[in-house]
Amino acid sequence: MATHDNTEHVSDATDEAVGWESKLRYFLNSDFVRSAPYWGIPFVLMSIAVYGGTGYNFAISFTDYEGLGTPDYSTLDLEMYAQALSSDAFIAAAQNNLVLLVGFTTICLVLGLFLAILLDHGIRFSEKFQTVYLLPMSLSFVVTAQLWLWMFNVESGILNLVVTTLGFNPVDWLGNPSIALGAVILALIWQFSGYTMVVYLAGLQSIPDDQFEAARVDGASITRTYLRIIVPQLKEASVSAAVVLMVFALKAFTFLYALVGRYRPPNGTDILATLMVRRAFKFGEWAYSAAIATMLLIMALGVIGPYLYYQYKQGGL
C-alpha cells in the first residue's frame, strides 16, 4: 500500500514538473521573449534617461541641493515647495501658464473648428487652403519664434507696418507687459490652429451626409444644424485636440527662449518652465527648480491622466 502511495506522489511530482517545463518552454518561445532583443535595450535606456531622471529630480526637490557636490539626503523636507508656493515670481508664472493654457487652447479649438467647417463645405481651392493652414504646424518652435520676432519688430515688423498704415502709432508687442503674453499666444495660435482644423475636418467627414439632409428638410438653419447636431458629435475630437494643445502650452519654454535668446523672456510672459530653467542654470538653485519641475509634471499628468483613463474605459487603449 505504501509503495502504491509513493508511486502516486512520484507520478504527481513528475506531472507537475512536466507542466512547469511546458509553461517555461511556452514562455521562452512567446513573442514577448523572442522580441526582447529589439525592445529590451531601448526600454532600459528610456527607463534610465526618463524615469531615472524623473526620480532623481523628485528626490533632490526635497533637499537644498545647489548643483555642487552630492545632494544631502539626510534631511528631507518640503521647504522648496513652500518657498515656490509663497513666491510672487512663482505665482505670476503660474498665472501666465494658466492664461496661456486656457487662452491658447480655447482660441485654437474655436478657430480650427471654424476653418474645418469652411473647408468641409467644399469651398474653392479647399485642398490648397488646407495645406496652407497646416504648414505652420510643420515648423519648429525655434523657426516660429524667429519668424514672429521679425513680425513683432517695432521698427520694421509687418504688424507695425499695418498699424502705422492705419494711422496708429507703432506697438511694442513684446516690450509692453500688458500685451506681451497676448502676442505670444497669437504666435502659438498661428502655429497650431491648422492642427485643430485637421482634427475637426476628419471628424466632420466621418459624419453621414444624411444628418445634414435631414436637418435641411426639417427647416433647420446651417448655424442651428452645426450647434445642435454636428458639434456635439465632435466631442472626442475636441478632447483629443485639447489635450495635445495643453501639453504644447506647457512646453512653450522652447518658443519663449528662442524668442529672446536668454532665460528671461519678455516681461509679462514668464511661465513656470522659464522660471524653472532660469533658477537652475542662472542662479544654481537646483532643488528649487526641481520642485517647480515636479509641480509641472503633476500639471501635465492632470491634463493627460483623465484623458488616458477615459480612453482606457472606452477601450481605446
From Swiss-Prot:
Enumerate the subcellular locations listed in this protein's record, separating them with semicolons: Cell membrane
UniProt GO BP: transmembrane transport
State the conditions that upregulate or repress this gene: Transcriptionally up-regulated by both L-arabinose and D-xylose via the pentose-specific regulator XacR.
Q: Which UniProt keywords apply?
A: Cell membrane, Membrane, Plasmid, Sugar transport, Transmembrane, Transmembrane helix, Transport
* Pfam annotation, one family: BPD_transp_1
Q: How does it sit in the membrane?
A: Multi-pass membrane protein
InterPro entries per record: ABC_transporter_permease (IPR051393), MetI-like (IPR000515), MetI-like_sf (IPR035906)
Q: Name one GO cellular component term.
A: plasma membrane
Does the entry feature the keyword Transmembrane helix, yes or no? yes
TM helices/strands, residue ranges: 40-60, 98-118, 132-152, 179-199, 241-261, 290-310
Q: Where is the ABC transmembrane type-1 domain?
A: 94-309
Q: What does this protein do?
A: Part of the ABC transporter complex XacGHIJK involved in the uptake of xylose and arabinose. Responsible for the translocation of the substrate across the membrane.
Q: Spell out the family assignment given in the record's similarity comment.
A: Belongs to the binding-protein-dependent transport system permease family.
Quaternary form? The complex is composed of two ATP-binding proteins (XacJ and XacK), two transmembrane proteins (XacH and XacI) and a solute-binding protein (XacG).
Q: What is this protein called?
A: Xylose/arabinose import permease protein XacH
Native organism: Haloferax volcanii (strain ATCC 29605 / DSM 3757 / JCM 8879 / NBRC 14742 / NCIMB 2012 / VKM B-1768 / DS2) (Halobacterium volcanii)
